[in-house]
């Protein structure tokens, strides 16, 4: 009897697993390849972001931190950026989202290629069940993607 019950119950238990998750609905990252050298890419991004009123809260140079402790790694810098005038609405809807903000942009070099990875706030907003201000998250992503392209010469001003 227990064996029959187990066979009948198994399909019900496996059916409760989610069919899709956030990562399948919205790609959580946007990746770009920079034609510029690593340091030039970082400087160009900083200049573009500053010129558009985006605050750079921090610049984390992982490769320099590694060097400081006698380790080595390929160049990798994270820019922590944002505009409180825009991002605050998301946190007002769900204060837990504050742990994910400000936005992050990773510039890294791999196999002599400079890459940029932007963590999309719309994917994060979906994870935190942002509904009322989801359009704001999408607008932030569009603006950030355009600013990244502009900074590396892949979009005309």
What are these regions (language model features)?
Residues 17-56, 149, 157:
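Terminal, regulation- and interaction-focused segments at domain boundaries
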Residues 1-23:
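Bacterial Sec-dependent N-terminal signal peptides
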Residues 41, 45, 62, 140-143:
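Stable alpha-helical elements in mature extracytoplasmic
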Residues 122-157:
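C-terminal partner/receptor-binding element of secreted or periplasmic proteins
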């Amino acid at each position: 009897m227990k064996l029959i019950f187990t066979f009948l119950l198994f399909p019900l238990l496996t059916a409760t697993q989610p069919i899709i998750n956030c990562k399948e609905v919205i790609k959580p990252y946007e990746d770009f390849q920079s034609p510029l050298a690593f340091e030039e890419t970082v400087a160009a991004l900083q200049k573009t972001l500053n010129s558009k009123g985006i605050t750079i809260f921090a610049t984390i140079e992982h490769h320099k931190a590694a060097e400081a402790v006698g380790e080595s790694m390929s160049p990798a810098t994270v820019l922590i950026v944002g505009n409180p005038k825009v991002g605050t609405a998301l946190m007002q809807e769900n204060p837990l989202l504050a742990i994910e903000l400000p936005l992050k942009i990773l510039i890294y070099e791999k196999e002599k290629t400079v890459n940029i990875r932007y963590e999309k706030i719309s994917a994060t907003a979906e994870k935190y069940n942002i509904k009322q201000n989801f359009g704001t998250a999408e607008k932030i992503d569009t603006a950030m993607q355009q600013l990244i392209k502009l900074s590396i010469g892949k979009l005309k001003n």
